[in-house]
C-alpha cells in the first residue's frame, strides 16, 4: 500500500506501472493494424530486460498482458488512449499552444515522436530517477527530441507549479497540459491541488486533457487488494496495481474544469474504443469493470 512521501524508480512501485504501460504500447505496435506506433516503448522494456523483454518476444504466454480476459483488452486500451492524447496535442498545437506540460511524464516519448511546430517547448515533470532512465535509454538509441525538451525533476505532491515557472514556463502564453494514467495514483486532496495548479497557470487559449476514473466500491476494492497480495505471495507473475492506487472519490474532471470556465468534453473509454474499432470488454471480464469506470476528458479555455 502507498504511504505519504513514498518514492520509487522505474522498476519499483508506481514507477513499474510505466513499464507495464510501455510494454502494452510495444505490443500494440506489433499488430498488423496498430492504432498508434510508439517506436521507443520497446526500447524501454529491453533496457530493463527480464520479463519486460520476454513478453515482447512471445516467451511468456501466461503473462498478464497476454491473457484474453485482461491483457488483450489492456493493450487495446493503451493503443486507444495514446491515440486520443496524441490527437489532442495535435489539435492544441494547431490552435496555437507552444508550451506542453506532461505531468508524471513517465516513459512518455511524445517530445520525440510527435511533429511539434517550431517554437514548442515540452516540459516533462516526474521523479528524477524516472527522467534519468528515460533520457539515458533514448540517448543510447540516438533519439532526438522534436521540440525543446525541459526536464523538471519534482514530485507532484511537492511545489511543482514553482518548479515549472522556474524552468521558464510562461503562464501568460497558451499551453497544453496532460495527465495521462496519473489521477488514480493521487489521493483526492492531491488531485484537487493538481487541478488548482493547472487552472492557475493555464492562460487564455490553453488546453488540458486527463484520463479520469470513478472509484470502485470499498468492498470490491478491498477484495481486489487482497486477491493481488495473495497472488504475489504465491509467486505469481503479478505486477501490483490495486495496492498502488488511491480509491478515493473526486469531482469528475469535466465537471471540475467546467465549473471554472473551461469548455470540457468527456468521452467514455468504451465509446472511444468502439469509435476506433476496438472491442469493448464485457462486464464479466477482468478488464470490463475497470474500462466502464474510465473517461477521457479534454477541455479548452477561451
UniProtKB/Swiss-Prot annotation:
InterPro entries: Ppm1/Ppm2/Tcmp (IPR007213), SAM-dependent_MTases_sf (IPR029063), SAM_mthyl_Trfase_ML2640-like (IPR011610). Keywords: Methyltransferase, S-adenosyl-L-methionine, Transferase. Its EC number is 2.1.1.-. This is Putative S-adenosyl-L-methionine-dependent methyltransferase Rv0281. Gene3D superfamilies: Vaccinia Virus protein VP39. GO terms for cellular component: plasma membrane. It holds the Pfam family LCM. It comes from Mycobacterium tuberculosis (strain ATCC 25618 / H37Rv). S-adenosyl-L-methionine binds at residues 126, 155-156. GO terms for biological process: methylation. One of its GO terms (molecular function) is methyltransferase activity. It comes from the Bacteria. Exhibits S-adenosyl-L-methionine-dependent methyltransferase activity. PANTHER family: S-ADENOSYL-L-METHIONINE-DEPENDENT METHYLTRANSFERASE YKTD-RELATED (PTHR43619), S-ADENOSYL-L-METHIONINE-DEPENDENT METHYLTRANSFERASES SUPERFAMILY PROTEIN (PTHR43619:SF2). It is an enzyme of class 2 (transferase). Belongs to the UPF0677 family.
Amino acid at each position: 500500500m502507498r504511504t505519504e512521501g513514498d518514492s520509487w524508480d522505474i522498476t519499483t512501485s508506481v514507477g513499474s506501472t510505466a513499464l507495464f504501460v510501455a510494454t502494452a504500447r510495444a505490443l500494440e505496435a506489433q499488430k498488423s493494424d496498430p492504432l498508434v506506433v510508439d517506436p521507443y516503448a520497446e526500447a524501454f522494456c529491453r533496457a530493463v530486460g527480464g520479463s519486460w523483454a520476454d513478453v515482447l518476444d512471445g516467451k511468456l504466454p501466461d503473462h498478464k498482458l497476454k491473457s484474453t480476459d485482461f491483457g488483450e483488452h489492456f493493450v487495446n486500451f493503451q493503443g486507444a488512449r495514446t491515440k486520443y492524447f496524441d490527437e489532442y496535442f495535435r489539435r492544441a498545437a494547431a490552435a496555437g499552444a507552444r508550451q506542453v506540460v506532461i505531468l508524471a511524464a513517465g516513459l512518455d516519448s511524445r517530445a520525440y515522436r510527435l511533429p511539434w511546430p517550431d517554437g514548442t517547448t515540452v516540459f516533462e515533470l516526474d521523479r528524477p530517477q524516472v527522467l534519468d532512465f528515460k533520457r539515458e535509454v533514448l540517448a543510447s538509441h540516438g533519439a532526438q527530441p522534436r521540440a525543446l525538451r525541459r526536464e523538471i525533476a519534482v514530485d507532484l505532491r511537492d511545489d511543482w507549479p514553482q518548479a515549472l515557472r522556474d524552468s521558464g514556463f510562461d503562464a501568460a502564453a497558451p499551453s497544453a497540459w496532460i495527465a495521462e494514467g496519473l489521477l488514480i495514483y493521487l489521493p483526492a486532496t492531491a488531485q484537487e491541488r493538481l487541478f488548482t495548479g493547472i487552472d492557475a497557470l493555464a492562460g487564455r487559449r490553453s488546453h488540458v486533457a486527463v484520463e479520469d476514473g470513478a472509484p470502485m466500491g470499498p468492498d470490491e476494492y478491498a477484495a481486489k487488494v487482497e486477491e493481488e497480495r495473495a497472488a504475489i505471495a504465491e509467486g505469481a507473475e503479478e505486477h501490483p496495481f490495486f495496492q498502488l492506487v488511491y480509491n478515493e472519490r473526486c469531482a469528475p474532471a469535466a465537471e471540475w474544469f467546467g465549473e471554472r470556465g473551461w469548455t470540457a468534453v468527456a468521452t467514455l473509454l468504451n465509446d472511444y474504443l468502439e469509435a476506433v474499432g476496438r472491442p469493448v470488454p464485457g462486464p464479466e471480464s477482468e478488464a470490463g469493470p475497470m474500462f466502464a469506470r474510465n473517461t477521457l476528458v479534454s477541455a479548452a479555455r477561451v
